[in-house]
Amino acid sequence: VATMKRHSTSIAITSAFEAFAMVDPKTVLRNLDELRSLTSDEHGAQRVAWTPVWLKARAWFEEKLKSLPVEHHYDSAANHWMTLKGESEKTLVIGSHLDSVPNGGWLDGCLGVLAGLEVLTSFAKEYNGKPPYTMRLVDWADEEGARFGRSLFGSSAFAGSHTIDADRVRTDREGTTLEAALQGCGVDVDRIGESCREQKNIAAYLELHIEQGPILEKLQKPLAVVQGTKGVERWAITFHGQEAHSGSTPMAARRDALAAAAKLALEIRPIARKHSQSVATMGSVKTFPGIVTAVVGRCETTLDMRDLDAGILAEMLREAREASERFAGEERCSVEWSKIWSIEPIPFHPDLIQLCEEAIVETAGVSEQLPSGPLHDAAEVARIGIPTVMMFVQSLNGLSHNRAEDTNRAHIEQAVIAFNRLAQKTIGCWTQHP
């Protein structure tokens, strides 16, 4: 599945498809508004995976399928698959996710799912329920990893890169294990690997997503082709010192675990700034005993590092580890590292990148190519050799993962039209070169 034939005649070939399968972007906007009103509060979206609100969103989405000639089911990893059977078993998959971070935005993930639903709907109408190739839409389970720190849960199970033994004992802030949360949603953790069965006949994967950054707005461009996703190293780091009374312990006698962690939090900034596309974040800090009258005896932190270059990513990680040991020594503490998750940089398929470029230019008149810093399910799909590409739509003020997340509604409409064109072009290539 790793090769797609690409020829200069593809634009002419796909023009016939563009006379059909017309999407209605306003339907996508109405559905987005409806989902927001159903699953958000004054703080933002609350569709955190493995929670009642997430299940409510999925039940709402199931209602949207009742008028379509699609089969739908949940696989062993709780990914929701919708299939519009075609004349051929060769399959185009469109995917994204309905889950959100706590207090999240109204577009992250769900835009791709609802745009995909509209593309499926349009093809079903124009081909009387049976397009030339099979089309599938997938709502991946727990893309965000917000509750347990394990991103891309469902798509990594699909790709065969997820080992549940390393994750079943992960806990959320309330102490609930990942295994217990999954069981509460009807998922048998020992059967998650069976999700790989869904790979059969998939020849390409497409995903539409908001940019979640400031670049497109700065360039005054509505849409972009995504070149690939950055590699990620995600670690839990714990500094161990000595709890002591804050009033009676001299400064020179303290073994302050938080002081060591704070030094590392500052040090990762210059480590990342050495490289133009690198980022590093310490996004979580827990102190123990966590009271105002005690020196911190234990400090638990997380580190997230990303870059497109695997060598640079490894160098950054090495420098961060060395710095943590140095700062632990300075504060007379110890430090331990525990890996949460990692993924290598993933380039997307060059032929699909070209088709995506064409679809964007034909829709918006101008395009851009960007790497993706945020993680996406598309990376897990691409890493197993399925030709993959993503399309970005501009984010306002570069904000995401909070209630201020927004995109110009006209740009959303353009994105839906361009994404539909991309699906048409992909199938057009297959029609010419089956």
Where are these regions (language model features)?
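N-terminal capping segment at the start of a domain
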Residues: 11-52, 399-400
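Zn-dependent metallopeptidase/amidohydrolase metal-coordination segment
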Residues: 28-38, 92-96, 297, 367-421
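Active-site-adjacent substrate-binding region
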Residues: 29, 37-38, 176-227, 265-270, ...
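A non-catalytic alpha/beta surface segment that caps or lines the substrate-entry region
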Residues: 40-85
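A short beta-alpha structural unit
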Residues: 46-50, 281-290, 302-308, 334-353, ...
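Alpha-helical metal-binding/catalytic segments enriched in His/Glu/Asp
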Residues: 94, 103-144, 233-239, 245-271, ...
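Midchain, well-structured core segments that form catalytic/ion-binding scaffolds
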Residues: 142-143, 147-310
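His/Asp/Glu-rich mid-to-C-terminal helical/loop segments that flank catalytic regions of hydrolases
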Residues: 227, 245, 249-274, 317, ...
